[in-house]
UniProtKB/Swiss-Prot annotation:
Keywords noted in UniProt: Isomerase, Pyridoxal phosphate
RPE1 insert domain location: 28-76
Binding site for substrate: R182, M353
Taxonomic source organism: Rickettsia bellii (strain RML369-C)
Upper lineage: Bacteria, Pseudomonadati, Pseudomonadota, Alphaproteobacteria, Rickettsiales
Gene: alr
Family of this protein: Belongs to the alanine racemase family.
UniProt keyword Isomerase, yes or no: yes
UniProt keyword Isomerase, yes or no: yes
Modified residues (N6-(pyridoxal phosphate)lysine): K83
Primary enzyme class: isomerase
This protein's name: Alanine racemase
Molecular functions per Gene Ontology: alanine racemase activity; pyridoxal phosphate binding
Enzymatic reactions: L-alanine = D-alanine
Cofactor(s) the protein needs: pyridoxal 5'-phosphate
Function: Catalyzes the interconversion of L-alanine and D-alanine. May also act on other amino acids.
Length: 410
């Protein structure tokens, strides 16, 4: 059994979900409210600009425009991105928790993630496969009632092929690329769908979605550019519902919400507003490790692989039982920090596969003993904060959390 414990506070995740739902359901202009508080004063500007139709070329102009559907503000739903095992925290446990909050839309990356989730939480929810459908897994998607997000014409053809094979209308989402340029139907493919609706024959397009590239940066004009492009495309698909906002998109304002929002990072305590603004979310993650070894070293002692740290005084060094095999980046060598009783303690020497050394010389003797718990991740050192130390993001910190930690759900 692992000596290190990873505690996931499900109540905090519930609270985060409720906050996001409240912002959406009540059209709370969170950024405006924050900007007007003295302690958060700054140059925050919510995106409330009027919708402007954007076209990439004149060819769409020859196609008759159709009116947009019913008001998006009505019946707005809050789903959850639980891909990558809920960012390393446990998709099954967290999905069951969100079910208690009436969440019914769960987004995963692949069919195997979707199948595992379906087996665990039953048939009452919608499970969306963001990477879409492929020849090898189409029958499994049908068997387990998983809905693919179709990202290109080839995936549409595959799903249509199996619709014909099964002689049934198959549900799907369409992903329109509005500028992030990863997955998603491109402009030419969307134009083909507009001009030839037979390309979607046999398919029930439930939602049209897109994905924001810089939603955590509320001042980035690219957000509005993507929004306008998305709305322009939606005019030609009046019967489909729409989804655009991820965690950061929720905070950009109601214009970005449409029918369904898809938070992920914010549920798990990561800051949806970027590193330069206060985090409105609760941190649900605590990683602790015990001191398993203590040694007094004299001035000039060298520590760890390749002797990258040399003591500059007589020092008391503690060793902790985790390392890069547990997803704790080697980049924290000689620059990471941990906490003992809310006191900052430096990491020294190279991060090893299974071990980390820390310098506890300056701590009170009463705080230093074998078995003493050390906070690696927690309220003193959130995933976002420790990510900043090595120039990465909190997402990577969470998704790297290894399987050797004993996970405890509270």
């Amino acid at each position: 059994m692992s000596l290190c414990t990873l505690e996931i506070n499900l109540s905090a995740i519930k609270a985060n979900y409720r906050l996001l739902k409240n912002i959406c359901e009540n059209s709370v202009d969170f950024l405006h409210n924050v900007a007007n508080k003295e302690e958060f004063a700054g140059n925050t500007s919510p995106r409330t600009a009027a919708y402007t139709l954007v076209r990439e070329d004149a060819s769409l102009g020859s196609t008759p425009k159709l009116p947009l559907g019913a008001s998006y503000a009505k019946n707005l739903l809050v789903g959850a991105a639980v891909k990558a095992n809920s960012y390393g925290l446990g998709a099954i446990e967290i999905s069951k928790t969100l079910l208690e909050e009436n969440c019914r839309y769960f987004f995963v990356a692949s069919s195997n993630e979707g199948i595992s989730l379906r087996k665990a939480i039953g048939d009452e929810v919608n499970i969306l496969i963001l990477n879409g459908v492929f020849e090898h897994d189409a029958l499994e998607l049908i068997e387990y009632n998983l809905i693919p997000v179709l990202n290109n014409l080839n995936q549409i053809k595959i799903w249509q092929k199996f619709s014909n094979l099964k002689n049934q209308l198959l549900p799907c989402y369409l992903h329109f690329n509005t500028g992030i340029n990863r997955l998603g139907l491109n402009h030419n493919e969307i134009e083909q769908l507009i001009n030839n609706r037979d390309l979607l024959k046999g398919l029930n397009v439930e939602y049209i979605i897109s994905h924001l590239s810089a939603s955590e940066d509320s001042d980035n004009p690219y957000n509005l550019e993507q929004l306008n492009k998305f709305k322009a495309y939606l005019e030609y698909f009046p019967n489909a519902k729409a989804s655009l906002a991820n965690s950061g998109g929720i905070f950009l304002g109601k214009d970005y919400h449409f029918n369904l929002v898809r938070p992920g990072a914010a549920l798990y305590g990561l800051n949806p507003l970027g590193s330069n603004k206060p985090n409105p979310m609760q941190n649900p993650v605590t990683l602790k490790a015990p001191i398993i070894h203590l040694q007094n070293l004299t001035y000039g002692s060298r520590i760890g692989y390749n002797m990258t740290f040399t003591t500059k005084r007589d020092s008391l060094i503690a060793t902790l039982p985790f390392g890069y095999a547990d997803g704790f980046s080697r980049n924290f060598s000689n620059q990471g920090t941990v906490f003992i009783n809310s006191r900052n303690v430096p990491i020294i020497g190279r991060i090893s596969m299974d071990l980390v050394n820390i310098d506890v010389t300056d701590l009170p003797p009463s705080d230093i003993f074998l078995g003493q718990e050390v906070e690696i991740i927690g309220n003193n050192c959130t995933p976002d904060k420790i990510a900043d130390i090595i120039g990465t993001i909190g997402y990577e910190i969470l998704t790297s959390l290894g399987n050797r930690y004993k996970r405890i759900y509270t």
